[in-house]
Amino acid sequence: MPKEIRWGVAHIFSSPNNTFVHITDITGSETASRVTGGMVVKADHEKPSPYAAMIAAARAAQQAMERGITAIHIKVRAPGGYGPKTPGPGAQAAIRALARSGFIIGRIEDVTPLPHDTIRRPGGRRGRRV
């Protein structure tokens, strides 16, 4: 008898400064695990690295599997808005680590919030005065 497939969603937020891996159930209301790059490395300058993202994703996957999730859809997000529209350096490493950890992979999609016209940066006309 084939084992039952239990779907989850892996929300990967990858900025130039850190990578978050947040695995929820299919509705997104119940968190199975949440790990960041800063939780797995000692030095702050290592937080955005692909290595930190890989370790964070592997740890999140292990915690989610203990809670019974066997298959995941992946949603990748960059800061968007007036920030960078492309994911940071840890996104691809996190996706590869989730695929290697034994999950069945469903869909991979980009959910970066993109403005339809443009967004005015904070700081005003004369800029941020330091």
From Swiss-Prot:
It comes from the Archaea. One of its GO terms (biological process) is translation. Keywords: Ribonucleoprotein, Ribosomal protein, RNA-binding, rRNA-binding. It holds the Pfam family Ribosomal_S11. GO terms for molecular function: rRNA binding; structural constituent of ribosome. GO terms for cellular component: ribonucleoprotein complex; ribosome. Part of the 30S ribosomal subunit. Belongs to the universal ribosomal protein uS11 family. Located on the platform of the 30S subunit. This is Small ribosomal subunit protein uS11. It comes from Ignicoccus hospitalis (strain KIN4/I / DSM 18386 / JCM 14125).
